[in-house]
Amino acid sequence: MQKKITIYTDGACSGNPGKGGWGAMLMYGDAVRELSGYSPATTNNRMELTAAIEALRALKEPCSVALYSDSSYVVNAFREGWLDRWTRNNWKTAAKKNVENTDLWKQILELTARHTVTFHKVKGHSDNPYNNRCDELARQAIQKKP
């Protein structure tokens, strides 16, 4: 039986593009692990994706994951079937343009294949303490830098 893991993620950018940070919280029972990172030149969408990628990468065995993000970009790609269409169309959008951030989408597809993942949309900058903490981790990463 797979462990049930709850993940919250967020990405932030100072300028878009600009310096970026990401934050994630992984929760299993009473255990909480916080992750964060920095990129000197990126976009908000890349940081949102990176947060989810790094959180899933931190799991050492196949898990049942509920992943919460305030990014419609990340959540809708899975829930609305965007990724299925993009892969079928050789990474082209419906308008026949190249899908942005293909490198990251390929990574997250590989990681989600290892786990049972459900994506959930949360309202950003609201009263969700876990989303707010991830936002704080992402913003702190921008300030700290490596």
From Swiss-Prot:
Mg(2+) 2 binds at D10, D135. GO terms for cellular component: cytoplasm. Its main location: cytoplasm. Binds 1 Mg(2+) ion per subunit. May bind a second metal ion at a regulatory site, or after substrate binding. Its EC number is 3.1.26.4. It comes from the Bacteria. GO terms for molecular function: magnesium ion binding; nucleic acid binding; RNA-DNA hybrid ribonuclease activity. It is an enzyme of class 3 (hydrolase). Keywords: Cytoplasm, Endonuclease, Hydrolase, Magnesium, Metal-binding, Nuclease. Mg(2+) 1 binds at D10, E48, D70. Belongs to the RNase H family. This is Ribonuclease H. The gene is rnhA.
